[in-house]
Amino acid sequence: TSLTVSGVQIDPTAVTPADIVGAVTADGVESGMEVIRQIFPKLNMTPGILLAPGWSENALVSAGLQAKTSHINGVFNCVCIVDIDSSTAGATKYDDVKRQKEKQAVTSANCYAVWLYAKVGDVIYAGSAMAAAATEATDANNGDIPNVSPDNKPISISAACLKDGTEVLLDQEQANVVNSFGVATWLNMNGFRLWGNNTACYPGNTDPKDRWFSVRRFFCWDDNTFIQTYFQKVSDPLNKRLI
């Protein structure tokens, strides 16, 4: 007995940064990141984290993600997680991260930048994908309230690596240097963990409400929740209780 299976496999190499960023045609057809606008009207849900694993190390894509975190549908905000390029054209050493971050123009308070990919066995994952999963798992363990940072939370990976799979061994001192650039990374301290709580606006902006990833995420969530909760009061007469 034999079984033959056929199908069509999507070729990810055919996707370009321009496809990810997207556009609005003259006929009003939206594509790429422009579709983010459709999330709330279609699902009545607000975006929480924007990411484009495998593409966000491109400056055009990372700029687009940062821009799309603010004023979604004119009122909502969220965060994005981007990768700092760790290919041969990017940062292959920890002290190159600052230069590469600046090259990609990653500076938003709503952006969490991650340097290094992650290995699980022989499979390589973009750092942004793993960081987003760790962030959502942290939220789930906290009643879906995003006030706890994913920083220093254990994650089940077997190695930190460059984009080509070359393993990178960072100690805490080196990982802290990466953090000082406003970039998170992976640290093996009795098991791998996400290491870094600064948003990409750091060190240029040290305001706690902008600098700390957990604070930035909570403010976005709280603002979005407030808007949805009290939208029903729009056009109602003002009274002391409502104030």
Q: What role is predicted for each listed range?
A:
Residues T1-V97:
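Small-residue-rich
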Residues N73, N77, D83-D85, A89-I243:
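Structured, hydrophobic secondary-structure cores that serve as assembly/anchoring elements
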